[in-house]
Amino acid sequence: MSSSKSFAYQSLLMVLCVTSPLVAFATQLEEVQGWLQKMYHAAHTLNYEGTFVYGQHGRLSSMRIIHQVTPEGEQERLISMDGTGREVIRDGGKVTCYLPDSKAVVVEKSRKLKKFPPEFPMKLDDLKNYYTFSLIGDSRVAGHITQGIEIVPKDPYRYGHQLWVEKKTGLLLKTHLLDEDNKPIEQFVFTQVSFLDQVADEKLVPAMDTKKFTWYEAKDTNDKDDKDEADFNVDWLPGGFKQDMNRMQKMPTGGMPVKHMVYSDGLSSVSVFIEEDVQHDPANLMGGSRMGAINAHGRHLGDYHVTVVGEVPQLTVEKICEAISTKNQ
């Protein structure tokens, strides 16, 4: 081989070595996005009934779920199979929690509460700057073949995820939330699931008699987001985090309105709660706290108390909490 041809050949090899991983990465990212789109579609179009186990903080809870989609929207009923048999019913944008142990019913908007199975975004254009996405092979869950997906954060401010998606329907059947050491700190897995043509109406109503229960309803004190009226600044956020919500709301059990702000990168999120605390109530959280995957950090800010909560590392909630200031500071 002549020197010129040898040089050209070596140059071509260098180009292939450099570009092949990029092509493979782009192809796999597209495959992952395809599975996430299928998963999102399944979550909002399928009728199903099943049993799943949810575990965090060393505790396991068994739940039954019934999910229905109609032209009027989605309906869902969650029944705890442990303890006192608490139930949660979702009907469109409203969530009603039935608590027989305290003889109470709490009504809230669904945007404030975590969903089961968990939801994940369909588009990865922005998220790929902060996470690595890959396929991790097939696995059998509750008798169904699933496609595994791994999501690894690129910085210490978010958790990782492993997902197992049912291949035929796209329903998410199993998840692991992974901490900074790549260890599961929260798990969700179906032990049985059946796909239905339709759901009987009686399966979507609570089994308990609530005539003697006390009803509470969380209400926003304003009808729209008050982003332009905020009196507080958040001077640091992890890359990609943007404000999703900024509202004043009344808690279900009463008391003074609380400012509630939500920040998210599309996958991870944190809530910021700010309330008046002129007397510096000793019951309010000071410093860090953890319950399973959920971390929190609280502190005083003048005549206010600030709490930051989220399924993110403790470092994240602490840095955000310490970065909150009043506009007149």
Where are these regions (language model features)?
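Short, surface-exposed coil-to-beta transition loops
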Residues: 60-64, 157-161, 173, 185-186, ...
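An acidic-aromatic
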Residues: 62, 66-118, 177-189, 195-197
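Short N-terminal edge-element motif at the start of the domain
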Residues: 113-157
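Gly/Pro-enriched, hydrophobic low-complexity segments
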Residues: 138-211
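Short, solvent-exposed recognition patches
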Residues: 213-301, 314-315
